[in-house]
Structures are given as C-alpha cells and as structure tokens.
Amino acid sequence: MSDFILISDGEDEATPPPSKRARKNRTPTDLNLDTEPSLQKQPPGSASTPFFLDETPLSDDVTVLKSSFGSGTGASSGRENNFFGKRVISLESDSEDSPGPESSKKYEPVYTDSWKKPCRLEFGSSDANSDDDPSWMRRASFQSSLSKDAIEVDSDHEKEDTGVEKMGRKKQTITSKSTSLSADSLPKKKMSKDEKTRAAEEKKLQKEQEKLQKAASKAEDAEHKKLEREKQKWAKEKDKALKCIVAWIDNKVLEGSFGGLLISGLKEKCITYHVTTNPIQRSIVWTMTLPEDIAQSLPLGSKIPYVLLLYEAEDFCNLVAKKELLENVYRVRDEYPSYTMCYLTNKLLSYVNKKERVEYKDPVNGCGWRKPPIDEAIAKLSTHYIGVHSRHCVDEAEVADHVVRLTSSLAHCQVRKKLTRLSVYADGTLMSKNAADKHLIRESIWLKVLVAIPKVQPRYAIAVSKKYPSLKSLLKVYMDPNISVHEKEFLLKDLKVENLVGRDTSVGEACSKRIYRVLMSLDGTIKTDDVENGAASFTLPPSDLI
C-alpha cells in the first residue's frame, strides 16, 4: 500500500489524519522541491533515493500535508503520537501567529539565485524495527540552502488574491445580466395620480377615435355598395339612362340638309335635346342629369367627354382647301380639353366624284375645280392626334341614324361597368369553341394568360404549363442574370406538344420567342408583332422618356 504524506499549515491538532497501515520495509527517501529540477550527484555512501518534485502534482499514492511543526516541542510530540506507524512527509513553516524576529522578514524579496539551489527533505536511514519507533519524524530535517524567510508562503496574501478574483467574477456576471435586460424589464417609476388619470383619459380618447373611424369606414362601405347597386340598376334599365341624357345641338347643324331627319330621330327615341349656340360651330355635345352621388363618382360629373362636328361635303372641302382643318382641331381642343372628337361628313365622296366628273367632261366651261388633299388631311387626323376620329355618311338618313345611336351609346357607357381585355371575350379566354382542352383553360388563370398572347395556341399553352406550372416559375428563369437573352428566347422551343393525331411536335422557336418578348416587354402599349420583332428591346417606356 502507498505511503501517506501529509502537508498542512496550521491544522487543527485535535483532528487526526486518516489512518493507513504502515509499511514494514520503508526505504529512506530524499524529497527535493525545486521549480527547476536538476539532477544532482548522489553521494557514494548514501542509501537514500532522491525524488524530484516539479510543478506537477504528486501521484495518488503520496499525500503531502503542509504543517507548521514550529519550534515548540509539545506540538511535535503530539504529531508524533498521531502519525505513529505512518509514513508522512511534513513541510515545516513558521507559524504566522507566532511572534518572533523572523516575522519582520516576512515580505522581503526572494532572489532568483537562491531558487536555483535545491530544497531537500531527508529522512534518515531506519532499521527494520523502526516502524514502531515514533522518533523518525523528529529525525526529519528540512535541509535547504534557502532561508525560511525566502520561501515562506503568505497565506493571507493568497486569500486576498482569491477574494479579489471572486469579486471580479461576481461583477462581470452582474454587468452581463444588466446588459442583457431589455428596456421593458427595467423597473418603471411610480406614476402619480395626475399621470394615471391622464393616461386613462388618453386611452379613452384613443378608443373613442378608433370606434369613430370604424363607424366611418362602415358608413363609407355601405354608401359605396349602395352606389354600385344604383349603377347596376341604371345599367340594366336602358330606357332610364336614355331619358337622362340631353343633346346640345348648335344652330348651324339644323341649317343643313340633315337637320329635319336628325330632330325626328331624336324624338322617336324620346331623347331630350336643346338647340343652342355652342362655342364651336356645327357641334353637338351631351350632358346627363344623374343623381348627385352617381354624378360625383364620374370623372367629369354630368358632362360627357365627347364632341361631334357635323359638316356638309362642300364645307369640309373648303376647310381642307384653306388648310384650316388642323387649326379647327386646336380650337376644339382648347374649348373641350380631354374630349374625344369626331368629324362627321355627309356625301363627301359623292360630292368629290361629281365635281371631278364635271371638270373632266367639260374642261373648257369648268371652273377649274381641283380635288383638295382630303385623304391626306383625314390620315393626319388619325396619325398625328389622339382621340380624333372621322366618319363619312352616304346620305342624311345615315347621319341622323348615326347621331341617335351615338347618343344612346353615350348614355349607357356612363353607368355601365368598364370593359377590360378579358371581359370582352366570353369567360375571359381567347380560344376556339371547338378546343379540346377548353375546360382546362377555363379553370387555370395561367393558361388564360398564355392563350391571351396572340398566336399562342391552347396546346402550346398546355405544354408550357406542364414544364412551368405558374407565371412565377417561368419569370424566375427569365429574370436569371446568368442566362443569356438568346437562351431565354429559345427556352420553350423544345417542349413537347401532345397531338391527338399524328406525331408529337414541339412549341417551336417562333412561339417561344413571342412568349418571352411579350412577357418581358418594357412597354405595355406596343403591339405584339412589334414586340416579336424586338421593338421593346431597343425602346424605353414612355415614363423613362419624360
């Protein structure tokens, strides 16, 4: 069994160390304590075995107890009795409590040269029967070249250091906890009575405002629904809307050959009209007597943004010959901004042909009449202006019928729900009635979008939807910057199209390019044929040009 080595400093003498059976054959041991151990030569006559104690701890079978076996003999004798039969290594040190001249040298510096000399704790040689002799502890002498003052350990100083370290750790934990606390968890100041009453009043006011806002929003929703219902009633009842429209006819219109037929046609349809002097001669404008709530919902209120200009053939030819047509357009625009304009002529072509025939048959007696650039002037109205149209009627009856039909259409358009591209076609799909996959297209919005692209057949749309089930999945590839534009244009060309009869074909390059350029076009007003030819790739949208 291993020996028991006790190292202690100021231990209680009443508590005995743990007992352990002593070895009978104990070998004398020299214990060298050194921070930098160095092998030393052993005297030839010595039988003791030196052991060097480095900074590493001792093994488990050796127990070192630090003890202050002072100079007093009483303490040493008590220790001898306690450790009788035990192998104990004792490191002596001066007791801190014992007064003496040595205590004045307690805090003197230790020189480095003195540490290089080894400290030795030697046990004298013992006989075989020395196990029962307690005097072996007395023979233990601590031979060291260092003075006791130099190697003395200040236990109080160590306690102070450990106390400071503990306090520092506690402060770190407290600061970390305080920083982790949020602003909400910090203790709040106690509110006074006035502050509490103010906070309660503010909460009450806030709740009342929220209630008022909810009530106002509900009232607005109810009014909006009521207005929509009234509009639907007006849209369904055509006669009701027709009775509310009023036509304001200029005096010059009735002076023409079609004045009588026009008035009779309006009376047959029970349309209200007024003959007056309009700011623009030969014009007809319309207004509607609608309820205030419906009139306020319209962009121009009770006014209808449309103006009709009626000309006889001779008057229109003179207007073009004098180059006053374009000036007339600007004058009407100044008077009726944002209005749609229409030039209506009566017997224009027949009048021109008649004049040309007379001039051709009798050039000598002719007045030298030449055809004015009517075609060029009408073409300019369509190409150079937005919202400017022209209409040529054969006779007076057609003029009167056109005015009556136009009046009824304007009356219904004001209260009718606005049409969109998808609402123009039945069920919002552009496909033939005999399409085999009609039910699939009606159930899928993505298929409706693909079919709405011109020249994209339903079977091509279905092939694309199988590979890319949504618009987002296709646009994700189209928006990938790592793929070139050429690859994106021909992305869909190899998709298989299932045919009921014959071989399966592919979508093709033309359809793939059309789908890409239509979906990725920067200008929504451009035509699809132009987009297919790459027009959108070289032009900027109107918003960027301003």
From Swiss-Prot:
GO CC list: Holliday junction resolvase complex; nucleus
EC id: 3.1.22.-
Enzyme class, spelled out: hydrolase
Amino acid composition bias (Basic and acidic residues), ranges on this chain: 103-120, 149-167, 192-232
Subunit annotation: Forms a heterodimer with MUS81.
Family: Belongs to the EME1/MMS4 family.
Protein name, entry field: Crossover junction endonuclease EME1A
Organism the protein comes from: Arabidopsis thaliana
